[in-house]
Amino acid sequence: KITETGSVWWNIMDSYNTRTQIRSNAAEALLAMQGKESRSWKNYKFKRYSAGHAYLKDGEQCMIPQRIAERAARMGYYLKSIISWCKTASMPEPQQSRVSRNVEYILHLTIQRTPYFDKKSYLSLSPELGGKQSFESEKLSDFWHLPTSAGGEGHGAQFPVQLPGRCIALTSRENDIVLDPFVGSGTAAAVAAVLKRRYIGFDICDKYLQTAEKKINKATNK
């Protein structure tokens, strides 16, 4: 259960209402984005169709972050910010009718109007852990210009260290508990440990849990 002064950070990328295959994991989706997926449309058991949708036209942007934010607000959460994370690099998109996506969104949700928020940590935290980058303004805004992850650990959707580091530093104190319900390669948990927070992480994939444990041990010199 989230504490009264706690925060929820939710990173999500928008999508388009297009016909697509439903892939089983992030690594499989990454191969497809890189053009290395050899299966054809008919070989997929699960598929998403874009025609006949109740409120989205074929090829239209879905506005997923905004819809989640609206629903969360109706459930009683406070939507504090929708932050734009402008990545230094992104996957190419073979689209000729629109611009390519280079922004992901981070929803900051709380259960009360005035959560714990340490704005000074933006300037005091090391840039390697999510503090102010050399090309960012002195003012902490809702536009974050942070690098993408170099990857290399078998997970197709890794965070850069700076992203969870900034979120954790802004909205928690030392010894607080950080929960990551999709721990993946363990980046958020490792950063939480470095910042002297306790952490809980779980994932549906045992392979990722093993990777996460190794990353946490390395970060804490165990």
Residue ranges and their predicted role:
Residues 1-211, 217-221:
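Core catalytic lobe of class I
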